[in-house]
Amino acid sequence: MRRAVCPGSFDPITNGHLDIIGRASKLYDVVHVAVMINQSKKGLFTVDERIELIREVTADFGNVEVESFHGLLVDFCKQREIPAIVKGLRAVSDFDYELQMAQMNNGLSGVETLFVPTNPTYSFLSSSLVKEVATWGGDVSHLLPPTVHEALVKRLGER
């Protein structure tokens, strides 16, 4: 069985993330979406909320499993016998950092990294940018799955 992981903070998941996960789901039998737990960063959504949102928007893929992880991604991969990491690249600036991470991960555990060029429609897109624009009242509905957009609007309204 071919397995891969798509890691990230997904705070919140965007259409760009969803595009990469969807493309990975066509290449692998099982795609694990690993939601990073970072104690030093207070997310807009809790890890459990992010997991639930990702499960909702990836349900139609049929071969995506979503869970959280804390620590080294290579340990997550080793525990689940996942030989590959799938990462989307938006720009050359992403490549510099992701290449270093890929080489470190391979050196630590032998896990391979597959770089997938981001769909040009989403080449500028990040969760941080979406949150910033939405905070100032900008329309980001075209950048997020509808259920995620609803959750974002609700959360920002609670602030």
Curated annotation (Swiss-Prot):
One record GO biological process: coenzyme A biosynthetic process
Residues annotated to bind substrate: S9, K41, L73, K87
Keywords: ATP-binding, Coenzyme A biosynthesis, Cytoplasm, Magnesium, Nucleotide-binding, Nucleotidyltransferase, Transferase
Cofactor(s) listed in the protein's UniProt record: Mg(2+)
EC number of this enzyme: 2.7.7.3
Keyword Transferase: yes
One Pfam assignment: CTP_transf_like
Main location class: cytoplasm
Enzyme type, top EC level: transferase
Site (Transition state stabilizer): H17
InterPro entries on file: Cyt_trans-like, PPAT, Rossmann-like_a/b/a_fold
Pathway connected to this protein: Cofactor biosynthesis; coenzyme A biosynthesis; CoA from (R)-pantothenate: step 4/5
Gene3D superfamilies associated with the record: HUPs
Source species, domain of life: Bacteria
One CC-aspect GO term: cytoplasm
Localisation per UniProt entry: Cytoplasm
Keyword Nucleotidyltransferase belongs to the record: yes
Reactions catalysed: (R)-4'-phosphopantetheine + ATP + H(+) = 3'-dephospho-CoA + diphosphate
UniProt GO MF annotations: ATP binding; pantetheine-phosphate adenylyltransferase activity
Binding site for ATP: S9, F10, H17, G88, L89, R90, E98, Y122, S123, F124, L125, S126, S127, S128
Family: Belongs to the bacterial CoaD family.
Subunit structure: Homohexamer.
Classification via PANTHER family: PHOSPHOPANTETHEINE ADENYLYLTRANSFERASE
Its job: Reversibly transfers an adenylyl group from ATP to 4'-phosphopantetheine, yielding dephospho-CoA (dPCoA) and pyrophosphate.
Name of protein: Phosphopantetheine adenylyltransferase
UniProt lineage: Bacteria, Bacillati, Actinomycetota, Actinomycetes, Kitasatosporales
